[in-house]
Amino acid sequence: MARPRDAPAPGGTARAGKATAATAPCLADATTLVGDLDGDGHPDKISNPGITGTRMTIQWGSANGSFGTKHAVSALLGARKGEVASAAVADFQRDGTLDMVVNLVTPADGGDPSTARVAQYRPGPLKRANLTSAHARHSDIGDHGEVQQLRIANYGGDAYPDLAILDNSGDGGLDRDVRLTKPGSGPGNFDYQLAVKYGEFGTTSEPPTVPGDGWKHFYKPCS
């Protein structure tokens, strides 16, 4: 049976109004990550149906361990009519606060891929109102193809989450691109050698494989 909206957070953290530091991020299920995204010390709930990053929602946590109403990430990011909003959430810097990679793009109606209107790596904490970050920086994920999905991956074999990008490369091409994370800096820029090693070229009729269990490599189930 589904847990009521105001029930305690899985994994536990601040209870009975006690303002304690949030516990480490954990998985409520395969598509739901619980962790502190806004930096208030209380875990928030990030739901990612289908693991594509395009239908992500956030429920902000409170001091008593409950979660609020669902907010669509696309709306918080200010996606315009016709735009596709993609997001990936993880503690890329392993500092205890979740971070986000975002991409906003209007899908192309021809052979050439569209360039992203917004493509950023946003280290946490993020503002609740619009998911902005005081230390946001441009990400080149929107410069090398039209992003269709963003997924967490484990390519480096270390403790730092990496990024898998499913993108339209134009003229029927559909590729898996990658960005590996470096300690302290978040997902890096395009690297041809890494793209050859970990990426995959495909087409719309024969798309590349994409990771579906990225969070599981880095986060344990909530107790």
Stretches with model-predicted labels:
Residues 1-223:
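Beta-propeller-forming repeat regions
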